[in-house]
Amino acid sequence: MNAIEINSLSKEFGKIKAVENISLEVKEGEIFGFLGPNGAGKSTTMMILTTLLKPTSGKALVAGYDVVSQAKQVRQNIGYVQQEISVDEYLTGRENLILQARLNHIPKHLVKKRIDEILELIELTDKQNEPVITYSGGMRKRLDLAGGLLHQPKVLFLDEPTVGLDIQTRRKIWEYLRKIHDKFGMTIFLSTHYMEEADNLCDRIGIIDYGQIQVIDSPQTMKNALGNEVITFTISNNDEKKSNLISKIKEIEYVKDITTNGEGITVFSSKGTEVIPIIFQLSSSFGIKINSISLTQPTLDDVFISYTGRELRDETENFNKRREHAKMKRLRA
């Protein structure tokens, strides 16, 4: 059975098509990753699925309920944790969860047990009576996650759950997400800028760009489709010679795909060790000098670049700049 069903969904803002005729299904108990550059349509899609925005056309069901005609029932069956941490830093951890319990109309006789259970799961029992203002960023994010779990939703939506956190804290959050998934068996729909995060957590991922779904599959299947090996090399820029070289490389038997980024060229191949000597021969014939070359295994970053022509790294850097700017404004206030 499917926890989420999207059929021919579109959303337009005036003449802008933010989401264009997308369809996808997410199975019950699945962890599904939704990836895309800024402006690709992923945030708009998530807002529609969480009933914060109405679609222009098409249909979406979440937990068996229509997001437009049965919005109230959808909200009763989902948890939504936003990108920005939304806990009250002047309340204690426990007080924050009590507030969330009341907002979600959890029966009074269940509140204490639920809160104790969640605090133990995210390892905040010892800190529950301390003001959140004393918590680290990772602790605040864990508390934020806990607030989205108290009413035990069937589907948990996570918008960039670890953005802005250091790598050690991100990995700790991944551990908690796995614990949450294993304990409650809930469906998790997450958007993320971290390829490693999607690779580690998700059963399947969908890549959206320009409002359209580009591909949906498991991370491993996507990587396998690119080829067994990735050849990355740099050359001195000469647009005409470079274009001719790329055309010839595409004709090599074992080459599956090729992308470019400035002076860098990335070749996806089933037999990289056999393709590299041919690349050197072709470069020499065009009078092109190869400055550096490497042979690696394909990553989810490579998959993303293959489908969108862009990296997600810039998106994360933009978020960090916005966060730093907001921090400086608070200090000046």
Region spans (language model):
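Conserved ABC ATPase signature
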Residues: 131-135
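Catalytic Walker B motif of ABC-type/P-loop ATPase nucleotide-binding domains
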Residues: 156-159
